[in-house]
UniProtKB/Swiss-Prot annotation:
It comes from Oncidium hybrid cultivar (Orchid). The lineage of its organism: Eukaryota, Viridiplantae, Streptophyta, Embryophyta, Tracheophyta. GO terms for molecular function: FAD binding; phytoene dehydrogenase activity. This is 15-cis-phytoene desaturase, chloroplastic/chromoplastic. Its EC number is 1.3.5.5. InterPro entries: Amino_oxidase, FAD/NAD-bd_sf, Flavin_amine_oxidase, Phytoene_desaturase, Zeta_carotene_desat/Oxidored. Substrate binds at R306, A545. Belongs to the carotenoid/retinoid oxidoreductase family. Pathway: Carotenoid biosynthesis; lycopene biosynthesis. FAD binds at A121, E140, A141, K148, H165, I166, Y171, D537, M547. It comes from the Eukaryota. GO terms for cellular component: chloroplast; chloroplast thylakoid; chromoplast; membrane. It is found in: Plastid, Chloroplast; Plastid, Chromoplast; Membrane.
């Protein structure tokens, strides 16, 4: 998971959770799916029924709470109503950009655009090109959608994911995308809080609660001032003074801090060291999976800027199930409904060029080739660098890519034999030297819901020294850290809660490593090569390495292609049709 994310007037949603999609009893699942009461609950989840109690007769479920005499039960979850995001400036700007594709003049000859990579950047590019009346041909190397939000199902029917993905209110393009697809109800919004473990008090947590009655930035200031467990008043004052130049100088000041690490900036601004220990280490690991002595301060300031400027910016939501099915497939269905193509198991092996150094075709690993009017690389930057043609390597924008490299990260999933009590229906900052953030997904996510057993999903970072270690070593180290977070429930030797199974997902090159002086190296979506474009969170956009950054990069890439329509249809490349040749 990477981030850019109480006194709330929203009441907790008190609703019946559907049995996980991995229910071993297909007949029971069909019974639930056919029952009209479930359809009613699903249809109303994010509307009039928020904050109400549903009583539904038991349909073969295990009891989670004590049932009443009439055979009904109540299951409590902490989902909150969707926050009011639609009137924020950033949301409206994102909505305007989305509308520009739908409202654009229909092309006489739709462009056939070949896109490599079906992560969020590639899916976004294809979606908005299709909205503009063009035909995207999206190629995914693997057999699963999503790229860095991919997930897989094991033999037991349980999903395990590439990362712990959190959706913030400060993600305007992502929030617009959910609305455009009609899937806003798939986001499970949580209480507006940030919750940190207390390393010096094993098993205890400290909270920053954002009051709903105050506008930004006062709700954030209130949350910080009310928390007296992590920083003293003196430290808070010095921290605030250190941040004053960012508040006064705005975006130009933020961009100028790209040359400094977080620690260097703190020293320059006279910010106490304990602010690093109590706040910035956790933020740095959540934002970019690295520590403050490596992370560019620009990254921290951008996140703080979003959280302090937008009332609901730091409010978080979990997706209600696995990302490939619950988010990526609706995008694919939208693309296909407008005439686009999406192909799995289609790995680009080579970018073959014309004599003028423009792209002639993509050669796939099975020997087939595909041609089009324009080409997009929406893969991680490390894959682009591997496949970059020799003829392009002396071009300055491609040379600068050498500064950009993906950061390693590990995602750990642990299934226990019991329900853990010392957790929340929320994202938790572990403040562990080995772990970043974690969540009990059996509580926070509907599809993974389990009334009897906990499933912890944890981000193991920084991972440089662990990426080559065995899965068992990583799990053993994780359990030792969890014994500090759950001292009464988890022991490293499993003498308490028993580990039923685990999955470890290693990503040697994840989002680009946001170290100092990276900003000038990030390329625009439109390259100097006519008809060749880039998408990905490493490309130039204001949300850095995040899901929001990936989606926005795809929109900007699609915008560049639409703007270049006349140039593209007039070239020889435009005379070729996009089709597969074996």
């Amino acid at each position: 998971m990477n981030l850019l994310g109480s006194i709330s007037t929203g009441f907790p949603c008190i609703s019946l959770h559907k049995k996980s999609l991995r229910d071993e009893n297909p007949a029971r699942k069909r019974l639930i799916d056919m029952d009209p009461r479930w359809n009613k609950l699903r249809a109303s989840r994010s509307s009039d029924y928020m904050g109400c109690i549903f009583e539904v007769p038991l349909l073969g479920f295990s009891k989670v709470k004590s049932s009443s005499a009439n055979g009904s039960m109540q299951v409590f979850c902490m989902d909150y109503p969707r926050p009011e995001l639609e009137n924020t400036i950033n949301f409206l700007e994102a909505a305007k950009l989305s509308a520009s594709f739908r409202d654009s003049i229909r092309p006489k000859k739709p462009l056939e655009v070949v896109i490599a990579g079906a992560g969020l950047a590639g899916l976004s590019t294809a979606k908005y090109l299709a909205d503009a009346g063009h035909k995207p041909i999206l190629l995914e190397a693997r057999d699963v959608l999503g790229g860095k939000i991919a997930a897989w199902k094991d033999k037991d029917g349980d999903f395990y994911e590439t990362g712990l993905h959190i959706f913030f209110g400060a993600y305007p393009n992502v929030q617009n995308l959910f609305g455009e697809l009609g899937i806003n109800d798939r986001l499970q919004w949580k209480e507006h809080s940030m919750i940190f473990a207390m390393p010096n008090k094993p098993g205890e947590f400290s909270r920053f609660d954002f009051p709903d009655v105050l506008p930004a930035p006062f709700n954030g200031i209130w949350a910080i001032l009310r928390n007296n467990e992590m920083l003293t008043w003196s430290e808070k004052v010095k921290f605030a003074i250190g941040l004053l130049p960012a508040m006064v100088g705005g975006q130009s000041y933020v961009e100028a801090q790209d040359s400094l690490t977080v620690k260097e900036w703190m020293k320059r601004q006279g910010v106490p060291v304990r602010v690093n220990d109590e706040v910035f280490i956790a933020m740095s690991k959540a934002l970019n999976f690295i520590n403050p002595d490596e992370l560019s301060m620009q990254c921290i300031l951008i996140a703080l800027n979003r959280f302090l400027q937008e009332k609901h910016g730091s409010k978080i939501a979990f997706l209600d199930g696995n990302p490939p099915e619950r988010l990526c497939m609706p995008i694919v269905e939208h693309i296909r409904s407008l005439g686009g193509q999406v192909e799995l198991n289609s790995r680009v092996q080579k970018i073959e060029l014309n004599s003028d150094r423009t792209v002639k075709k993509f050669v796939l690993n099975n020997g087939s080739v595909i041609t089009g009017d324009a080409y997009v690389f929406a893969t991680p930057v490390d894959i682009l660098k591997l496949l970059l043609p020799e003829e392009w390597k002396e071009i300055s924008c491609f040379q600068r890519l050498n500064k950009l490299a993906g950061v390693p990260v590990i995602n750990v999933h642990l299934w226990f034999d019991r329900k853990l009590k010392n957790t929340y229906d929320h994202l938790l900052f572990s403040r562990s030297p080995l772990l970043s953030v974690y969540a009990d997904m059996s509580v926070t996510c509907k599809e993974y819901y389990d009334p009897n057993r906990s499933m912890l999903e944890l981000v193991f970072a920084p991972a440089d020294e662990w990426i080559s270690r065995s899965d068992s070593d990583i799990v053993d180290a994780t359990l030792k850290e969890l014994a500090k977070l759950f001292p009464n429930e988890i022991a490293a030797d499993q003498s308490k809660a028993k580990l039923l199974k685990y999955h470890v997902v290693k990503t040697p090159r994840s989002v680009y490593k946001t170290v100092p002086n990276c900003e000038p190296c990030r390329p625009l979506q439109r390259t100097p090569i006519k008809g060749f474009y880039l998408a990905g969170d490493y490309t130039k956009q204001k949300y850095l390495a995040s899901m929001e950054g990936a989606v926005l990069s795809g929109k900007l890439c699609a915008q560049a292609i639409v703007q270049d329509y006349d140039k593209l249809v007039s070239t020889a490349v435009g005379d070729q049709s996009a089709e597969m040749f074996v």
